[in-house]
Amino acid sequence: MTVTDEMTAEVFISRMYDTYGDVFNWWIPPETKTFINELVTELGADDSFVLNRSISLEAKCESCDDMLFCSVGADGSGLWRIYHLTWSHCRERGGFPRRTDLPGRKAALEYIRDNFEEEYL
């Protein structure tokens, strides 16, 4: 499946389900506040992904609990990262939570697609 610049995570997930059915393991949680709160707790409020930015949870992997977050600054700049939260309910150190930095939404969705196809097909 081709990912376009305009494609939202919701459209991407819908098309991946159309292509792969229930084997596709990413979804959009109806409630995201718990996940965002845990991310902020683990990173710390002074982290550059959090500080003066609006955070959204774009998608979650059911199989491995990875989550795609977008963080938007006041200037409209977006940071895209996949995080694997530890659920420690405290600030983490030493490379945790584990993360993958991505240059934008399209790259993030392509990363999810490519990893899914490599690991699950």
Language-model features and meaning:
Residues 85-121:
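Ampiphathic alpha-helical segments that act as solvent-exposed interaction surfaces
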Residues 2-54:
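Negatively charged, low-complexity tracts enriched in Asp/Glu with abundant Ser/Thr
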Residues 4-8, 60-62, 76, 88, ...:
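Preference for intrinsically disordered or flexible, low-complexity segments
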Residues 5, 18, 22, 46-47, ...:
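Acidic-enriched, low-complexity/disordered segments with a strong bias for Aspartate over Glutamate
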